[in-house]
Amino acid sequence: MVVPAISVGAAFFLLPLARLAVVGATGPLGPQAYLAVVTTPQYLEALLSTVVLSVAVTATTLVIAGIAGVFLERNRFLGREALLSMLTLPLAFPGVVIGFMVIMLAGRTGLIGELTALLGVGRLVFAYSMAGLFAGYLYFSIPRVILTIMAAAEKLDPALEEAAKSLGAGPWRVVRDVILPALAPALIASGAICFATSMGAFGTAFTLATDIKVLPIVIYTEFTLLANIAMAAALSIVLGVITWATLAASRAVAGATAAAAG
């Protein structure tokens, strides 16, 4: 039973990828379609924009969720459970809904624009820019990372921190030398997932990316509007390779970090 199950699982995951790779190499450009991703300005710009946006979202998410996760795990206060429920609420929303919420906040008739207009500094609108995408991606990324960090923070040994303090280490030194190394595997793993999710996010980008191009939207355009199936497949494979490599590298680094810490 094990071998058939593995075979079916491998076929389920690998055959679509193999088919996608073949389609990407059989269009008008042939295998050169993969090279065109980095030599054609519009594709390269979309790729770089997506990578930069994903890196920025990941870095910001790790800082915010890292601090919030440790704080929420170590402190009990009135309303904590309600706050946790509210923080995890974005997990229930599809990307299109999150994009709509960003528009309600920072769109042409959004709350932020109305407030800035009342203050006499003009109507601030950024929902349809890279800043709007950043806000939307950050909104759905933070809950995922907070839950992971809280689980890791629960396993922190307070005795190690007390020992460091007794040796004269200040608060920042304790964070740098004790807390961060202990949380490193969780930070690396959750950061990689955050990056991969941001790279492939479509619903939020579809709602907000009217004036900017990110890779999922370019793939959608090539596939549906231009009927350029081969180029859409090549772009999809490149996107998949980048995210797969990131996740594989994070597993290796997180494993090595955990082994060193242990």
Where in this protein do the model-derived segments appear?
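Glycine-rich helix-loop "coupling/hinge" segments at transmembrane-helix boundaries
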Residues: 26-27, 104, 201-227
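Short glycine/proline-centered loop/turn elements that form peptide/ligand docking sites
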Residues: 156-160
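Juxtamembrane intracellular "pre-TM" segments in multi-pass secondary transporters
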Residues: 34-36
